Amino acid sequence: MREILHLQAGQCGNQIGAKFWEVISDEHGIDPSGTYHGDNELQLERINVYYNEATGGKYVPRAVLVDLEPGTMDSVRSGAFGQIFRPDNFVFGQSGAGNNWAKGHYTEGAELVDSVLDVVRKEAESCDCLQGFQLTHSLGGGTGSGMGTLLISKIREEYPDRIMNTFSVVPSPKVSDTVVEPYNATLSVHQLVENTDETYCIDNEALYDICFRTLKLTTPTYGDLNHLVSATMSGVTTCLRFPGQLNADLRKLAVNMVPFPRLHFFMPGFAPLTSRGSQQYRALTVPELTQQMFDAKNMMAACDPRHGRYLTVAAIFRGRMSMKEVDEQMLNVQNKNSSYFVEWIPNNVKTAVCDIPPRGLKMSSTFIGNSTAIQELFKRMSEQFTAMFRRKAFLHWYTGEGMDEMEFTEAESNMNDLVSEYQQYQDATAEEEGEGEEEGDEEVA
């Protein structure tokens, strides 16, 4: 079996991670004690990817939970599925990172990282053939960003040929916890560009907009945001957890999605969007799902795909539906909006279908786009970073932990390079096509 080892770091990472395990345990028919109560052999066929079968037929998540303070871990442990995790896999410090990337990466986090790696090794040894790692974390705080990226680089050293996949929650000015988020996020992206194979950018701003506009929630809570994140995570991992042909492992997904190694930041989307507790009962048609899925308002990253072009796209449809109809609809989208797909990668849209829909829905679709418009997110981050860094605001918190200003400058220029690379491929055309692209701002339908 091709196993995936899951890591969650920091408060945000542990909260969305715990929610992810609730959702997929439910989809695989596993109750909070780790016992299988399902009704479909498909649920068990690839259960080993995410779960270890322990004695007495119990299924235990291949998950390592990390934090620099005990608080969030305690709430995960006392949460709905808290008892399903292996107790030894909770690794936590007492000091906290105080939203300081340097503490997570160089001081506090560096002290804890070896005990985390011990647990990771132990989990990796129980794997038959480990395909890679996935990390849930946020980029705005101290632990998820600083220690999360430290873990990534340490794991990279030890398992250089395994795929590294992250679900990274990107800070946004509208939903801000901390004034130093732009520093933490820029320093993290500096690491992610070099050390991960696939990063799903999940953006609080986009999640808030979805809650306000589409779900009509007047005061969205983190619970509502996490509900959206877990639906998306469940969707993008469907191909890895259920039998299927397309993108059935992390490496195949990377091969299909990443045309240039640095450009591996994906924009996820989900349809139909439903709020917690009120899953819609009206059946959606395949055309509606396809239309919604490509709609800018459904993207989980606050970038408008109409401002850029898709390098590659993967779509996952779930539920009982006609493959023929799915293929027709996907072709239809590409033909109608051909200017939004780069013409120098033919067949750059791939589609997978899985029979088992998520709970409460007849069918759903998940979207993974590698779009040049993601540069908007990095630009936004970079502008905020520069505004503070020019004045050296708050820098003493970082230099006090032994960091050098040079590292800030490098991170800043690496991020700006990333933006220019996206721009370069957005403008590139196939030679014979010339520059005859007219960019309309019409709705992508």
From Swiss-Prot:
Tubulin is the major constituent of microtubules, a cylinder consisting of laterally associated linear protofilaments composed of alpha- and beta-tubulin heterodimers. Microtubules grow by the addition of GTP-tubulin dimers to the microtubule end, where a stabilizing cap forms. Below the cap, tubulin dimers are in GDP-bound state, owing to GTPase activity of alpha-tubulin. It is found in: Cytoplasm, Cytoskeleton. InterPro entries: Beta-tubulin_BS, Beta_tubulin, Tub_FtsZ_C, Tubulin, Tubulin/FtsZ-like_C, Tubulin/FtsZ_2-layer-sand-dom, Tubulin/FtsZ_GTPase_sf, Tubulin_C. The MREI motif is common among all beta-tubulin isoforms and may be critical for tubulin autoregulation. A motif (MREI motif) lies at residues 1-4. One of its GO terms (molecular function) is GTPase activity. The keyword Transmembrane helix does not apply. Signal peptide: none annotated. Some glutamate residues at the C-terminus are polyglycylated, resulting in polyglycine chains on the gamma-carboxyl group. Glycylation is mainly limited to tubulin incorporated into axonemes (cilia and flagella) whereas glutamylation is prevalent in neuronal cells, centrioles, axonemes, and the mitotic spindle. Both modifications can coexist on the same protein on adjacent residues, and lowering polyglycylation levels increases polyglutamylation, and reciprocally. The precise function of polyglycylation is still unclear. Some glutamate residues at the C-terminus are polyglutamylated, resulting in polyglutamate chains on the gamma-carboxyl group. Polyglutamylation plays a key role in microtubule severing by spastin (SPAST). SPAST preferentially recognizes and acts on microtubules decorated with short polyglutamate tails: severing activity by SPAST increases as the number of glutamates per tubulin rises from one to eight, but decreases beyond this glutamylation threshold. Residues 429-445 have a biased composition (Acidic residues). The lineage of its organism: Eukaryota, Metazoa, Chordata, Craniata, Vertebrata. GTP binds at residues 11, 69, 138, 142-144, 204, 226. The modification 5-glutamyl polyglutamate is found at residue 438. One of its GO terms (cellular component) is microtubule. Its cofactor is Mg(2+). Belongs to the tubulin family. It comes from Pseudopleuronectes americanus (Winter flounder). Pfam families: Tubulin (PF00091), Tubulin_C (PF03953). This is Tubulin beta chain. Keywords: Cytoplasm, Cytoskeleton, GTP-binding, Isopeptide bond, Magnesium, Metal-binding, Microtubule, Nucleotide-binding. Its main location: cytoplasm.
